[in-house]
Amino acid sequence: MAYLLDTGVISELRKPHCDPGVATWMAGIQPDEAFLSVLSLGEIRRGIELHRPKDPKAAGALERWLLGLEAHYAERILPITTAIADRWGRLCLSQPLPVSDGLIAATGLEHKLTVVTRNGSDFQRSGVNTLNPFS
């Protein structure tokens, strides 16, 4: 089985006191089963830039973490392809979704991945399989 981690799950893994359910679930899968969307990387980058003016040191730490994610997941970072964009466009006609959730759902559907998220209800209408590892 293969999984698409949403931003909330990726961010949880960085916490010093990560949710035990998330930590246990992540330890139970093979590294090559976990994928990221470029959208999650963009959301993390946005968070870094929002922090930078207020706390440059924290922004620097987050940036190093992001670079580590990019290196670790290198071949498992999924772009928005024309096929994904097409699927997203079709999904949105029948099931209006926020853009990023819709594109993540379309990515999961296109690659036959289960979206790992705390917010399964955000994706329910899309038909993508979801998993909530939080305790």
Positions of predicted regions on the chain:
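Residues at the C-termini of beta-strands that transition into short coil/loop
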Residues: 38-39, 81, 119, 134
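Active-site neighborhoods of divalent-metal-dependent phosphate/nucleic-acid chemistry enzymes
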Residues: 46-51, 60, 71-118
